[in-house]
Swiss-Prot record:
The gene is hook. Pfam families: HOOK, HOOK_N. Homodimer. Interacts with microtubules via its N-terminus. Keywords: Coiled coil, Cytoplasm, Cytoskeleton, Developmental protein, Endocytosis, Endosome, Microtubule, Synapse. Involved in endocytic trafficking by stabilizing organelles of the endocytic pathway. Probably acts as a cytoskeletal linker protein required to tether endosome vesicles to the cytoskeleton. Involved in modulation of endocytosis at stages required for down-regulation of membrane proteins that control synapse size. Not involved in synaptic vesicle recycling. Required in R7 cells for boss endocytosis into multivesicular bodies (MVBs). Has a role in regulating adult longevity. SUPFAM superfamilies: Hook domain. Belongs to the hook family. This is Protein hook. Its main location: cytoplasm. Residues 135-436, 478-588 form a coiled coil. It comes from the Eukaryota.
Length: 677
């Protein structure tokens, strides 16, 4: 029972999800605050559930406090019951009221189901009920059945004194609901008219009673006045006894006639209202009979729809049987095709066995070549290490040789400069000797010194000598002139010493400039650098060619390895396919006939395939193996020779210094990268 109720709840929840609401309404927790239900009611009947009423529902109660949720749910349920009693004229005395406390605290599904039943009743009875009914009809049949059951429970709980109409809904469709709703609307309109007529009748009856009371009061007053002898009027004048023909009698008579006329009019109106009420009762009976007829017709429609559903189910079963028949036919055709494929696979399996044997031989041969390749790789690595050590030794020796050559050249230049200085000194000594012989030492010394002195100092000395002569001629015997002469002589000696040191410095600089000319050195270095750059470009080109050759060889080796692995995988795939084909052949032979399967031995096929496997296969000739090994050896030797030549050409660059060689890019990295590949 609980499972069925939960099923009804989930059906109502699926219908509620189809509504376009702003608040979340996908599960029980989102419905427990009452916000989504209030928005749905506002959407169904905005004239009853107004926006001001919706504003009273606190949307901030979600997941905060269950008491706030309970207050929201109380407002919603009370408004729902008011709507049913005032607008729809439903008295839900037998319907169990939803427990809002259990919904707010525990999200009870049973209580939520009752709340959703009430919401469903509002949707079906509102002004836009046609659209909501069509939305319900678009749902699945199981959901429609549960929704119809919920509506039946809601309709059955109405008060019997109200003459409620139980809506009979079919399990397969909800179209009969529309006729019932139309009749219910007509019944509600007639009830409204009866209610209005009854109201008018009550008003007229009240008016009649009031008139009767007024008449009785007037009659009592009339009787009292008749029995009294004297009556004083309002103005204090005695009216005298009530007698025929008196003024008072005539006044009372006139009032009595007026009251009688009013009474007659009220009685006529009452009779008219009675006739109208009888007419409306007859119309109501006719409408009730029409409703009964329509209910019968709806029952017939439901039975016819049930029959149609049964026929549909039988038609669906017939279609399923036809589809199964077609599938069995296709399976029979596939079985015949499989027989043919088994024969083809047997032929292919024999070919695959032969190919498998060939692939195994190829794998063995490739394994041998793989071992040889590994040996060659190790030898190449050893040779590269030896080459590196020898090249490092060669570089050191070249560096030492260059240093020694530089020292030798420096010593040779120093020797040449010393020899030249010796010759120059000899010549000067000879000249000095000749000068001493020819003239005085002072004159020769001054001549030699003047020749060696620069022109500025010579002019200064001549000027000083001229001044000295003038002073000697003008003041020959004075002490001041003697002092001046001594000062001039001291200055001359100082200048001569400075001149001598300058001459020595000039000679040393001239010898140094002759021995080390920077322009010549720059030109020679430029030529050497150009030659070295050309050699470097040539060697780099050779190195790139050797690297490309080695990379192509490495690619070939990797390609052969990949081919070998691919062949091995193909052999394994062929073997597995062969096993599958053998199993299929056994199954097909067994499926032909069990008697034939017992007569035919399945092991015969295995023996046949074993014999086919043991047959000798053509082997690779010895000449082909020798050609492959010789080609591989030649390829390895060529690659090694190219690498060594490029390395030696780079290391033995003519005219390069140690620093210039260190600036060049080492080609060893590319070779090591080639080896690692």
């Amino acid at each position: 029972m609980s499972a069925a109720k939960n099923e009804m709840y989930y059906s109502l929840l699926e219908w509620f999800k189809t509504l376009n609401l702003n608040a979340p309404h996908a599960d029980a927790e989102s419905l427990a605050d009452g916000v989504a239900v209030a928005q749905a009611l506002n959407q169904f009947a905005p004239e009853s559930f107004t926006d001001s009423w919706l504003a009273k529902i606190k949307a901030s109660a979600v997941g905060i406090n269950w008491r706030l949720r309970m207050s929201n749910l109380k407002k919603v349920t009370q408004s729902l019951y008011d709507y049913y009693s005032e607008v729809l004229n439903y008295t839900l005395s037998d319907f169990v009221k939803p427990d809002v406390q259990r919904i707010a605290e525990k999200c009870d599904l049973v209580e939520l189901e009752r709340l959703l039943q009430l919401v469903l009743g509002c949707a079906v009875n509102c002004a836009k009920k046609q659209s909501y009914i069509t939305e319900i009809m678009c749902l699945e049949e199981e959901l429609q059945a549960n929704i119809m059951r919920a509506l039946q429970e809601l309709e059955s709980s109405r008060n019997a004194a109200e003459g409620g109409i139980v809506t009979s809904l079919s399990r397969s469709s909800i179209s009969g609901m529309l006729d019932g709703k139309v009749l219910q609307e007509e019944r509600d309109a007639m009830a409204q008219k009866c209610f209005e007529t009854e109201k008018k009748m009550l008003l007229l009856i009240d008016e009649k009673t009031n008139l009767q009371q007024e008449l009785q009061r007037v009659q009592k007053e009339f009787a009292r006045l008749e029995h009294s002898s004297t009556v004083i009027g309002d103005d204090g004048v005695s009216l005298g006894p009530v007698q025929t023909g008196s003024v008072r009698y005539n006044e009372l008579r006139r009032q009595l006639d007026l009251l009688k006329e009013e009474l007659l009019q009220s009685e006529g109106a009452r009779e008219d209202l009675k006739l109208k009420a009888q007419q409306q009762e007859t119309d109501l009976l006719h409408m009730q009979m029409r409703i009964d007829e329509l209910l019968k017709s709806t029952a017939e429609v439901t039975t016819l729809k049930d029959e149609v559903d049964v026929l549909r189910e039988s038609n669906d079963k017939l279609k399923i049987c036809e589809g199964q028949l077609d599938t069995y036919k296709k399976k029979l055709e596939d079985y015949n095709d499989l027989k043919k494929q088994v024969k083809i696979l047997e032929e292919r399996s024999a070919d695959y066995v032969q190919q498998n044997a060939q692939f195994e031989e190829d794998a063995k041969r490739y394994a041998n070549t793989k071992g040889q390749i590994e040996l060659f790789k190790k030898e190449i690595q050893d040779l590269h290490t030896k080459l590196d050590s020898e090249s490092s030794k060669n570089v050191k020796l070249e560096f030492d040789n260059k240093n020694l050559e530089g020292k030798n050249l420096a010593l040779q230049r120093a020797k040449d400069s010393l020899l030249k200085e010796r010759d120059n000194l000899r010549e000067t000594v000879d000249e000095l000797k000749c000068g001493h012989l020819s003239s005085n030492s002072g004159l020769t010394g001054t001549a030699v010194s003047r020749e060696l002195q620069p022109p500025a100092t010579v002019e200064k000395m001549q000027r000083l000598e001229a001044e000295n002569k003038a002073l000697r001629e003008g003041q020959g015997g004075q002490t001041a002139l003697a002092q001046l002469l001594d000062d001039a002589n001291k200055r001359c000696e100082n200048l001569r010493e400075q001149l001598k040191s300058a001459n020595e410095r000039i000679l040393s600089l001239s010898h140094a400039s002759q021995s080390d000319d920077p322009i010549l050195k720059e030109s020679e270095f430029g030529k050497q650098i150009k030659q070295l750059m050309e050699l470097n470009e040539q060697k780099t080109l050779q190195l790139e060619e050797s690297v490309t050759q080695s990379s192509s060889l490495q690619c070939k080796v990797t390609q052969l390895e990949t081919n070998l692995t691919a062949r091995e995988q193909e052999v394994m795939a062929y073997d597995a396919k062969y096993r599958k084909c053998l199993e299929k052949a056994k199954e097909v032979i067994k499926s032909f006939d069990p008697r034939i399967a017992s007569a035919i031995d399945a092991s015969a096929l295995e023996k046949y395939f074993d014999v086919v496997e043991e047959e000798p296969k053509p082997k690779m000739s010895v000449m082909e193996e020798q050609l492959m090994t010789s080609a591989f050896y030649r390829l390895g030797v060529n690659a090694q020779r190219d690498a060594v030549d490029s390395k030696l050409a780079i290391l033995m660059g003519s005219g390069q210094t140690f620093l210039a060689r260190q600036r060049q890019s080492a080609p060893r990295k590319s070779l090591s990268a080639m080896k690692s590949k």
